[in-house]
Design a protein with these regions (language model features):
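Short aromatic/hydrophobic-glycine micro-motifs
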Residues: 98-99, 132, 190
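Donor-nucleotide binding loops and adjacent catalytic segments primarily
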Residues: 148-202
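Solvent-exposed alpha-helices and their adjacent loops that cap or buttress functional pockets
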Residues: 74-76, 130-133, 200-202
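Charged active-site motifs of nucleotide-sugar-dependent glycosyltransferases
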Residues: 132-139, 166-167
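Active-site and donor-binding regions of nucleotide-sugar-utilizing enzymes
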Residues: 1-127, 141-152, 163-165, 173-175
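Structured helix-beta-strand junction loops
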Residues: 27, 78, 133-135, 187-188
């Protein structure tokens, strides 16, 4: 989520944060488990650490290796156990920041592995089923929310235009109508497919 959408929803975000803190105090759980979304959850972690005796567990560790590495100070202070779905993060946190974390596997990797076992790779059938040409494919995965698609798709199409020998295939997200994509696709030659993301990536 970019800066402007956050600004537009600031009142709602603060209201939800206040309610979340009140619920934690009222319920007094054995442990608070935070999931992803560091902009919101690190604030909750700080509150729980400073105002209660409840342990804080964090699932899907903040991607401080990509941006906002300074957040490690808050993580060390406020989070008791950190659980990662990316194997390389263990070395990053442990060696660089001396903060041990746990790699617990990746549900998406497990899902893809199960899909590959159940559906042997068959590129010819995929091309035929979707009326695609027998030429290399650039897969476009612009996101699952309208704001992400609005922000990402035009830039992706611009970058992909530098490869005229490839065909562009856009993986449509569930709940997003084809018409929404078409307003950003414009005159670009793009095939939009739904419910075939793993098949496309094979």
């Amino acid at each position: 989520m970019g800066f402007i959408p956050v600004l537009l929803h600031l009142r709602t975000i603060f209201a939800n944060m206040k309610r979340c803190k009140e619920d934690i105090v009222a319920w007094n759980p054995d442990v608070v488990i935070l999931v992803d979304y560091p902009g919101f959850n690190l604030n909750i972690a700080k509150f729980v650490h400073s105002e209660t005796q409840i342990p804080v567990f964090y699932y899907i560790s903040p991607k401080i290796w990509a941006w906002k590495e300074y957040r490690i100070k808050n993580i060390k202070r406020d989070v008791d156990e950190l659980f990662s779905i990316l194997p390389f993060e263990v070395e990053f946190y442990t060696l660089k920041h001396r903060y041990p974390i746990h790699y617990v596997g990746n549900p998406t990797v497990d899902e893809v592995t199960a899909y590959q076992k159940a559906h042997p790779k068959n590129p010819e059938a995929f091309l035929a089923d979707n009326n695609l040409e027998d030429k290399p494919i650039i897969a476009l995965l612009a996101g699952s929310r309208k704001q992400e698609i609005k922000d990402n798709l035009p830039d992706m199409l611009k970058a992909a235009s530098a490869f005229p020998d490839y065909q562009l295939v856009l993986a449509g997200a569930p709940g997003i109508a084809p018409e929404y994509y078409k307003q950003y696709v414009g005159q670009a030659k793009v095939k939009i497919i739904f419910a075939q993301t793993y098949r496309l990536l094979q």
